[in-house]
């Protein structure tokens, strides 16, 4: 499956039928407690990541939350 992540095309080895957002994020090494995810211009609540299916060509924007002071 090909998806665009932060403007870069990525190929992820996921079965199209079972390609969930949570699985893709885990596969790419993202930690769920430290990111905000936008899928095709919509912010996706982390409580829904398990239910959201990805499709070939989807656009993800992933923003990491960093603390500081």
Q: What positions do the PLM features span?
A:
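Ubiquitin-like/PB1-type beta-grasp interaction modules and other compact soluble beta-rich domains
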Residues: 1-68
């Amino acid at each position: 499956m090909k998806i665009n992540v932060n403007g870069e095309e990525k190929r992820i080895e996921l079965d199209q039928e079972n390609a969930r957002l949570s699985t893709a994020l885990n596969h790419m090494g993202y930690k769920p407690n430290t990111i905000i995810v936008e899928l095709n211009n919509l912010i996706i609540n982390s409580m829904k990541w398990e239910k959201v299916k990805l499709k070939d060509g989807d656009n993800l924007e992933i923003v990491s939350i960093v603390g500081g002071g």
